[in-house]
């Protein structure tokens, strides 16, 4: 199971707001139910609504904290739909009672039902839905909000990359395994042409110092030009661990912002905020 991180909730306004409101609504319903029960006349069935709603809120907090909504979205919608029915029945019983405490409990259930409806609409929609892209653009990085609807057109030379809410990272191969399968057009930052070019041996590195077999007679290594400009910005939609056998690759975490020098090919030359440079798989990134 994915690791729970409080930053996933605190850094996502939608998760933070909806979870906070649901907790507040549940507390109103719970405390009012206790008061009503002390004076008698509280429907026994509504206690099940209180318990079930508590489980739903805890479950949603775990989903937001572990960022696994795309994995369990079908189960989430099912459980929330059942919770909506249960709370609605309790609302119909409590709001018409003469007791002020019962009406307060009904108000808490109404607020909770509103949050559940929003959750169902969010998790029950397809990943490419416009409202999901708008809501997700505010998560963690404010840069994403500006890119919504105004981002640069993305290259489709190798097909569409996976949606940002895909449950599984795309199948990837190491940069060495892709020799001969990448674009044959020149790419800035690649010595001797694009990766896989016939004019370059598979053992020649794409970045950094050349191998000893390519040294001139005087023993001084050739200078490999590095990109000086990174005009593009990209956001990581998955975490990626660099292949230890390829020193040119860089690791990055989900939602991390990278600067990119060129967006052609399956591997992009990127620079992290720390200044570390290297290549990153293009279908793990989305342009801002």
From Swiss-Prot:
Location of the protein in the cell:
Cell membrane
Question: What are the alphabetically sorted keywords of the record?
Answer: Cell membrane, Membrane, SH3 domain, Stress response, Transmembrane, Transmembrane helix
Outline which residue ranges sit on the Extracellular face: 42-44, 92-103
Task: Give the transmembrane ranges.
Answer: 21-41, 45-65, 71-91, 104-124
Task: Name the InterPro entries on file.
Answer: SH3-like_dom_sf, SH3_domain, Sho1_SH3
Record flagged with keyword Cell membrane: yes
- Polar residues bias located where? 162-187, 202-217
Region: Disordered, residue numbers: 151-228
Record topological domains on the Cytoplasmic side:
1-20, 66-70, 125-288
Q: Which residues form the SH3 domain?
A: 229-288
Q: What membrane topology does the annotation report for this chain?
A: Multi-pass membrane protein
Which Pfam families does UniProt cross-reference here? Answer: SH3_1
Known PROSITE patterns for this protein? SH3
Report the family membership: Belongs to the SHO1 family.
The protein's role, per its UniProt record: Plasma membrane osmosensor that activates the high osmolarity glycerol (HOG) MAPK signaling pathway in response to high osmolarity.
Q: Oligomeric state and partners?
A: Forms homooligomers.
Q: What is this protein called?
A: High osmolarity signaling protein sho1
* Protein's organism: Aspergillus niger (strain ATCC MYA-4892 / CBS 513.88 / FGSC A1513)
Lineage per the UniProt record: Eukaryota, Fungi, Dikarya, Ascomycota, Pezizomycotina
């Amino acid at each position: 199971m994915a690791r729970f991180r409080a930053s996933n909730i605190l850094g996502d306004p939608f998760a933070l707001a909806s979870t906070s409101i649901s907790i507040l609504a549940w507390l109103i319903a719970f405390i009012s139910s206790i008061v009503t029960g002390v004076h008698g006349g509280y429907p026994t069935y509504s206690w099940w609504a209180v318990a079930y709603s508590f489980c739903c809120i805890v479950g949603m907090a775990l989903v937001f904290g572990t960022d696994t909504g795309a994995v369990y979205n079908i189960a989430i919608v099912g459980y929330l739909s059942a919770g909506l029915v249960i709370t609605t029945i309790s609302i119909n019983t409590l709001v018409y009672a003469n007791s002020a405490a019962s009406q307060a409990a009904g108000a808490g259930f109404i607020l909770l039902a509103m949050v559940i409806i929003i959750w169902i609409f969010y998790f029950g929609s397809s990943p490419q839905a416009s409202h999901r892209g708008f809501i997700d653009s505010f998560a963690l990085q404010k840069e994403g909000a500006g890119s919504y609807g105004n981002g640069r057109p993305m290259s489709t030379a190798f097909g569409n990359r996976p949606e940002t809410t895909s449950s599984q990272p795309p199948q990837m191969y190491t940069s060495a395994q892709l020799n001969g399968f990448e674009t044959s057009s020149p790419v800035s930052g690649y010595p001797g042409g694009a990766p896989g070019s016939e004019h370059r041996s598979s053992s020649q590195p794409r970045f950094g110092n050349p191998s000893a077999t390519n040294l001139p007679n005087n023993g001084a290594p050739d200078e490999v030009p590095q990109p000086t400009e990174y005009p593009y910005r990209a956001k990581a939609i998955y975490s990626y661990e660099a292949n230890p056998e390829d020193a040119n690759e860089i690791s990055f975490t989900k939602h991390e912002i990278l600067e990119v020098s060129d967006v052609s090919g399956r591997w992009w030359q990127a620079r992290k905020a720390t200044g570390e440079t290297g290549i990153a798989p293009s279908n793990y990134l989305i342009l801002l």
